[in-house]
Structure formats: structure tokens, C-alpha cells
């Protein structure tokens, strides 16, 4: 039974390969080209490392599909004022979609990645996604949109590891990753400058408009709604007698809505594109949710109605950004499901 390991050239995927090989698993490397190389091509270095480890490497070109399923929706989200989460979309459609298909094509039964998350077996639910043990690196949030059937074929060797231990173990083995530095936040956006990326792609974005308080008073002008995110404080360019925050976007009237801290209190949010990883009838009444990465889980009650998730927070929170992911957990840190945030509770 062969396990294909998705090889980016970085620390995590390399150690995932090393771990599986040392466990006696039959493995091969699988590298996906998601974006055309603009500088140094990592493939020769990845191939050399695989040769050193005695592992075959397969390379698959997915640049056109990545443009269609990840880059284009990313640009379209900004055009309508959403704050997209391309990593979650990539995991669902590319890594555990088309790349998993490529793994099967080369004869692999499973696809392993360097994600910091765990997969467990449950007597009723089958494969269950759970948070990784390293709270600083846990990536279950970004995996909550991956269909359950795809997770059945996934392997996460690093789920019980901490990042520093991974680095230390590679160093102890005198293995240097071809790309040792941390990858940037959005792999296809140079220098993580999404504003420059969108302008370079000549994306037609909403123009300037008024900044209006929650009481209806115009107090300035914004540079385009696409440049702001719900809950944002810095970068508004307004001198005011109290700190101001983005509390919403009126796309129809091209208005940026701002208010003081008290205006941030949101009772909950609604999510669409729902992905259930545990049958909804088995969800507990009280769950934990995350509406952004690196956030402590929030106590909430979540209902599924008409194909959407309605999350009501136990305590009001800053508004959830439209386009981000709502991930739902039980108290044992199992991921129950996820969705794409549509807006605040009606």
C-alpha cells in the first residue's frame, strides 16, 4: 500500500516523508506545480532530496486548475467586498481534490501532507478530523472545508508533533529541506502584498466612497471597500475622539461602516458552502467555533437550516469577516464541520 506524500520542499512535508519511511511505509513523493515558477525552480532540489532518501518523485502540473479554483475566486471575492481564505479553498479543491486524484493515478492509496492536524477513527463517524497538538501550528481550521470522503484517504503524520521538535529531528538526521524557510501566507501573492497582486492582475475593484458611522454621520472617505476587513482598526486614516473599527460594508451604496468598540459586538454569523464532517444530528448543543485563524475557540450554539450554519456566540464578538471560514468543534477538539461566512446573524 503506497502513500504519496505531497512535497512542497519545506520542512513539514519533508519530515512527514521521513517519518512514514522510517515507520516502514511504502512511500513516494508528489509535487504539485500550482503556480508557474517565477524564480528558482524547487523541483530539482526536491528530486535530489527524494533520490537521497530512496523515494520516487512524481511532478504534476496543476497551474490551470489552481488559477480556476483558487486564484480566480480569490480575486472575485475582493471584487464584491469579501475577505477570502484561499488556503481553505485550496485544501478542499486542490490538495485533497485534484492532487489526491493524482496520487491515485500513480498508484497511491493515501495522500499524506505536512499539516498539523490529527485524524482519528470513530465507531460511528469513521475518520474524524481533530486539532493538532501544537496550538501555535494547528491547521484544522484550514481543513474544515475538505469533504469527509477525501479525509478518509488522508494521512497527517505531524498531528502529534510540535514545530520545534520537527526542526530538531531533521537537524539530528542532518537533513536540510530544499526550502527551509516558512512559506508565505498566500503562496501565489508575492511578498503577501494582495493589494499589489490585485492591481497587477488588473482586477476591477470598487473605488473610493464615504466612511459613515453607525449613527449615519459621514466622517471621511475610504480607498475602496476591498481594502478593509470587518473588525479592522488600523489604516482607516481618520482622527477621531475614540478608536474606530470597521463594523460592516454597505456594498450597494459603497459605504464603509465604522463605530466604537461597543459597535463591534456581534451576536453571531451565518455560513454557506457547508461541509459536514460529523452528522449534524450528532452535534452537541454547545459547541466551539473559530471565525478566524489563530483564534481561541468561542462557545456557541450552531444550527443547520436550509443548507446554512447559524452560529450564535455565547458572548458577543467582533464581526466575522465575510469570506472567511467558520469552523465548528466539539469539546474534544473534533472538527464537526465548516462553512464560508456569509455575514452576521439576521
Swiss-Prot record:
Disulfide bonds: 90-187
Superkingdom, natural source: Bacteria
Reaction(s) catalysed (UniProt annotation): S-sulfanyl-L-cysteinyl-[protein] + uridine(34) in tRNA + AH2 + ATP = 2-thiouridine(34) in tRNA + L-cysteinyl-[protein] + A + AMP + diphosphate + H(+)
Gene Ontology biological-process annotations: tRNA wobble position uridine thiolation
Keyword tRNA-binding: yes
Residues where ATP binds: 6-13, 114
Function field: Catalyzes the 2-thiolation of uridine at the wobble position (U34) of tRNA, leading to the formation of s(2)U34.
HAMAP family: tRNA_thiouridyl_MnmA (MF_00144)
Protein's recorded name: tRNA-specific 2-thiouridylase MnmA
Organism listed in the record: Nitratidesulfovibrio vulgaris (strain ATCC 29579 / DSM 644 / CCUG 34227 / NCIMB 8303 / VKM B-1760 / Hildenborough) (Desulfovibrio vulgaris)
Record gene name: mnmA
Amino acid at each position: 500500500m503506497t502513500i504519496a506524500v505531497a512535497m512542497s520542499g519545506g520542512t513539514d512535508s519533508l519530515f512527514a516523508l521521513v517519518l512514514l519511511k522510517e515507520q516502514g511505509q511504502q512511500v513516494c513523493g508528489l509535487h504539485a506545480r500550482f503556480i508557474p515558477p517565477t524564480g528558482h525552480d524547487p523541483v530539482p532540489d526536491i528530486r535530489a532530496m527524494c533520490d537521497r532518501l530512496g523515494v520516487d518523485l512524481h511532478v504534476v502540473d496543476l497551474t490551470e486548475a489552481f488559477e480556476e479554483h483558487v486564484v480566480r475566486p480569490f480575486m472575485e471575492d475582493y471584487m464584491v467586498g469579501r475577505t477570502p481564505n484561499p488556503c481553505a479553498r485550496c485544501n478542499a479543491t486542490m490538495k485533497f481534490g485534484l492532487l489526491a486524484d493524482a496520487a491515485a493515478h500513480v498508484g497511491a492509496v493515501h495522500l499524506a501532507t505536512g499539516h498539523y492536524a490529527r485524524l482519528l477513527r470513530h465507531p460511528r463517524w469513521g475518520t474524524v478530523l481533530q486539532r493538532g497538538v501544537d496550538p501555535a501550528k494547528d491547521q484544522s481550521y484550514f481543513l474544515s472545508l475538505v469533504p469527509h470522503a477525501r479525509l478518509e484517504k488522508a494521512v497527517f503524520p505531524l498531528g502529534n508533533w510540535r514545530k520545534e521538535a520537527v526542526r530538531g529531528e531533521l537537524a539530528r538526521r542532518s537533513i536540510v529541506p530544499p526550502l527551509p524557510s516558512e512559506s508565505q501566507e498566500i503562496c501565489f501573492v508575492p511578498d503577501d502584498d494582495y493589494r499589489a497582486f490585485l492591481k497587477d492582475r488588473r482586477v476591477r475593484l470598487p473605488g473610493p466612497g464615504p466612511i459613515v458611522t453607525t449613527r449615519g454621520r459621514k466622517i471621511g472617505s475610504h480607498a475602496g471597500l476591498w481594502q478593509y476587513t470587518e473588525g479592522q482598526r488600523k489604516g482607516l486614516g481618520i482622527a477621531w475622539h475614540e478608536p474606530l473599527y470597521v463594523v460592516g460594508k454597505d456594498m450597494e451604496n459603497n459605504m464603509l461602516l465604522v463605530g466604537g468598540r461597543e459597535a463591534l459586538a456581534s451576536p453571531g454569523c451565518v455560513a454557506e458552502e457547508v461541509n459536514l464532517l460529523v452528522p449534524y444530528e450528532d452535534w452537541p448543543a454547545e459547541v466551539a467555533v473559530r471565525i478566524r485563524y489563530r483564534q481561541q475557540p468561542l462557545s456557541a450554539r450552531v444550527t443547520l437550516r436550509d443548507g446554512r450554519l447559524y452560529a450564535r456566540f455565547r458572548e458577543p464578538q467582533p464581526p466575522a469577516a465575510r469570506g472567511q471560514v467558520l469552523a465548528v468543534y466539539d469539546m474534544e477538539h473534533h472538527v464537526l464541520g465548516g462553512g464560508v461566512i456569509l455575514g452576521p446573524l439576521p
